[in-house]
Amino acid sequence: GDVYKRQVQETKMQPGQADFAPEGYTEYTYSAEKKGYSGTACWCKTAPLSVATGIGIEEHDHEGRVLTLEYPEFYLVNCYTPNSQDGLKRLDYRMTWEDAFRAYLLELDAKKPVILCGDLNVAHQEIDIKNARTNRMSAGFTDQERAKMTELLAAGFTDSFRAIHPDEVKYSWWSYRFHAREKNAGWRIDYFIVSNRIADKIKAAEIHNEVFGSDHCPVELDIDL
C-alpha cells in the first residue's frame, strides 16, 4: 500500500535545515538543543490531530528524542533512544530513560493504541546481533539494556518484525568500521513496536537491508487499523 508516514531518527538538523520536501507530505521535526546532534522527524500524508515533543520530563527533553503524533485510532511515537556509549558511560542515564519512556508509552496506551518506531539502540536477543558472544559488554547488547526491552514488551507491546518473522536473521544497522556491512556483521536495533491489542492487525513487517545510504537501513510496518 501507500507509505503514509516516514519517520527518521538522528536527523542532526535544526528547524528549516532540510533541503527536501516530499510532495504530498507534511514535515514535523524535533531537534536537540545541541546543534548537529540527535533529533527526530516525521513526514506524513495525513495530518495528525496533535503533535507533542518530548515525554514531559525536563531531564529527558533536551535531545530531540521523542516525537508523538496523535491520530484518531492511535498514537505514532518516533523515538531515538540514547546510546549507552563507549565504556557504557551513559548506561545509568539510559536505565533512567528506559523507565521514564516506558511509563510515557503506557500513559498513551491507556488512551489509545501505540505504534512506536525508531532506533531503540538495543539488539534484544542473540538472533538480533551477528556477534553475540563478543558484544556482551557493548553498548546496545548489555544484559541491562536487553532486560529493559523485555520489560517494555511484557508491559503490553509486540515487536512487529519478530512477531511476523520469529526465526529470521536480519539486521538494520552495521558499524562503518571493519567492513561490517560487507560481512553482514550487523545488529537489529530499529523497530516498529505496537500495542498488543493491535498486533493482530499487522499485515507485514520488513527490514530493507537492500537499501544503502546510511549505517542503518529502513524498517517498514504495514498495519491495517
Give the residues covered by each predicted segment.
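Metal-dependent phosphoesterases centered on the DNase I-like endonuclease/exonuclease/phosphatase
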Residues: 26, 97-185, 189
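Conserved beta strand-loop-helix elements of the APE1-like EEP
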Residues: 35-51, 168, 179-200
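Short, small-residue-biased leader/transition segments that mark boundaries at the very start
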Residues: 1-4
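Surface polyanion/phosphate-binding segment centered on an Asp-His-Pro turn
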Residues: 206-225
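Surface-exposed cleft-lining segments at the edges of enzyme active sites
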Residues: 56-57, 81-98, 133-137
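Active-site metal-binding loops of divalent metal-dependent hydrolases
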Residues: 11, 120, 217
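Structured beta-strand-rich core segments of catalytic domains in phosphoester-bond hydrolases
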Residues: 12, 17-84
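Acidic carboxylate-rich catalytic motifs and surrounding loops in phosphoryl-/glycosyl-chemistry enzymes
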Residues: 55-56, 159-168, 205-209
